[in-house]
Curated annotation (Swiss-Prot):
It comes from Clostridium acetobutylicum (strain ATCC 824 / DSM 792 / JCM 1419 / IAM 19013 / LMG 5710 / NBRC 13948 / NRRL B-527 / VKM B-1787 / 2291 / W). Keywords: Cytoplasm, DNA damage, DNA repair, Endonuclease, Hydrolase, Magnesium, Metal-binding, Nuclease. It catalyses: Endonucleolytic cleavage at apurinic or apyrimidinic sites to products with a 5'-phosphate. This is Endonuclease V. The keyword tRNA processing does not apply.
């Protein structure tokens, strides 16, 4: 699959990262210009890390499934040294080089990408799901297992039934949604990446839940694959 070269990865400082984020955030579109029934392939993306000596390495895994049957269509992965230091709010700059390399290995072109992480639910609205969207030129969704507290705002827990949700509102703006995908099970944190609205994100996530996990199967399978690959590589 081809990607769009939005920017290089020579930047290494917080100030440079902020400039890039500020230029991209203006291009976020939280609307869906597609119909859910037109989705054929959906991809889950996850990364895992390990340290060897004084160096840190990462592996990115992408699992492509048939949106309607759940059948695994394709798997791809890539790994390498992580050269960008961790800085809160700028995680995408560490992860994107590996994500892009892995996407380029795909023989199939997914209609939707779902990331194990955040999108619009981010200090600068530029979580990995949002930042990656500009390179992928595809709708993206962020699905997080834990809550990223922005501006000191806590989330409100939804009711205990399956499908219950509460929007995450910060400074009168909806950043994402707390979604309970299974009765009496911890919720997940869903946010738009780009080129999609929150209602559609919720429908897609809910459709892709099975008996094995509270996570959509795309994200769950990608998570399992990254742990497997990390064990093999580290």
């Amino acid at each position: 699959m081809k990607t769009v070269n939005v920017h290089g990865f020579e930047a290494s400082s917080k100030e440079e990262f902020q400039v890039i984020q500020s230029s991209l955030v203006k291009r976020i579109k939280l609307i869906s210009d597609f119909k859910e029934e037109d989705i054929k392939l959906c991809a889950g993306v996850d990364l895992a890390y390990w340290t060897k000596g004084e160096k840190q390495y990462g592996v990115c895994c992408i699992i492509v499934i048939d949106y309607n049957t759940g059948e695994i269509i394709e798997k791809a992965y890539d790994y390498g040294e992580i050269e960008v230091p961790y800085m809160p709010g700028f995680l995408a700059f560490r992860e994107l080089p590996l994500v892009i390399k892995t996407v380029k290995k795909l023989k199939n072109e997914p209609d939707i990408f779902m990331f194990d992480g955040n999108g619009y639910l981010h200090y600068n609205h530029m979580g990995i799901a949002t930042h990656a969207s500009f390179f992928l030129n595809k709708p993206t969704i962020g699905v997080a297992k834990s809550y990223l507290k922005v501006a000191g705002v806590d989330f409100e827990m939804p009711e205990s039934f399956e499908g219950a949700f509460k929007d995450i509102v910060i400074n009168e703006e909806v950043y994402g949604r707390v979604l309970r995908t299974k009765k009496d099970v911890k919720p997940i944190f869903v946010s738009c990446g780009n080129y999609i609205d929150l209602e559609t994100c919720t429908k897609i996530c809910s459709k892709l839940i099975n008996n094995d996990s509270r996570l959509p199967i795309t994200v769950r399978l990608a998570d399992l694959e990254t742990h497997k690959r990390r064990s093999e590589l580290s």
